């Protein structure tokens, strides 16, 4: 479960059955997964892997090897929603043209749009088909809106705390604010050796450039609109969000 102090500290580190030698980052799109992956990869002896499945999906690995550290990233829902609208990865054209208020309320739709992001599509096809990683993992149903997707994905992400593996749960904003403090806590928590090389910060934008599939896209608001806050609050699990340090007053 989420520690009571997480809202203040911004990270939680749970030891597993063995000292980790590799790690995989999980978290929804636009939640700092690339930043955290690069930060750990540059400044520890841990080797990054993607072998446990798509990092933005629900947990669907067959097993978690004892030497693999699972790193889970979360982000404030307001900033996250704005980023999802600004870069609507894997959304079909009809989603990409929606203005922000309609985008967050629309039935969530994504497709397997590019082979290079999905090994199965690369191997056996399926380009343009619904992205099953964004469907409900049990029922297969489409999520009614963006925040319903977040709520379910967050439940899946937090389930790693129950899976008997080594887990780091971290808030993107806190790690970005104090990356060296995060790394120090990581090394201590898992008895990892201190790197011989000096700290290497992350100074440039990470991730691929988003390429829209429509000629014109609506502008994303500079901040989360006040008139949409009641919808956000009604769609999220506010108790869980607050335990993660997110309040939407």
Where would I find each of the regions flagged by the language model?
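PAPS/PAP-binding and catalytic site of the sulfotransferase fold
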Residues: 34-43, 167-194
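PAPS-dependent sulfotransferases, especially Golgi type II membrane carbohydrate sulfotransferases
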Residues: 1-23, 27, 138-144, 158-161, ...
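Short, solvent-exposed coil/turn linker segments
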Residues: 99, 171-174, 198, 220
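PAPS-dependent sulfotransferase catalytic domain
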Residues: 1-170
């Amino acid at each position: 479960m989420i520690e009571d102090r997480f809202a203040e500290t911004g990270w939680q580190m749970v030891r597993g059955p063995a000292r980790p030698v590799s790690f995989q980052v999980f978290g929804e799109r636009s939640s700092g997964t690339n930043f955290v992956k690069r930060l750990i990869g540059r400044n520890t002896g841990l080797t990054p892997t993607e072998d446990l499945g798509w990092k933005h999906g629900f947990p669907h690995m067959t097993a978690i090897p004892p030497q693999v550290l699972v790193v889970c990233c979360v982000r404030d829902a307001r900033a996250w929603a704005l980023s999802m609208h600004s870069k609507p990865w894997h959304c079909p054209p009809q989603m990409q043209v929606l203005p922000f208020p309609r985008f967050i309320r629309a039935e969530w739709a994504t497709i397997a749009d590019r082979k290079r992001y999905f090994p199965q599509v690369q191997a056996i096809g399926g380009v343009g088909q619904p992205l099953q990683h964004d469907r409900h993992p049990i029922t297969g149903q489409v999520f009614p809106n963006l925040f319903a997707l977040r709520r379910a994905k967050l439940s899946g992400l937090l389930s790693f705390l129950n899976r008997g593996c080594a887990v780091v749960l971290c808030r993107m904003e806190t790690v970005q604010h104090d990356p060296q403090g995060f790394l120090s806590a990581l090394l201590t928590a898992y008895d990892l050796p201190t790197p011989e090389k000096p700290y290497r910060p992350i100074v440039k934008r990470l991730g691929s450039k988003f390429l829209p599939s429509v000629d014109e896209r609506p502008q994303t608001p500079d901040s989360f609109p006040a008139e949409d806050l009641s919808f956000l609050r009604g769609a999220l699990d506010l108790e869980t969000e607050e335990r993660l340090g997110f309040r939407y007053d």
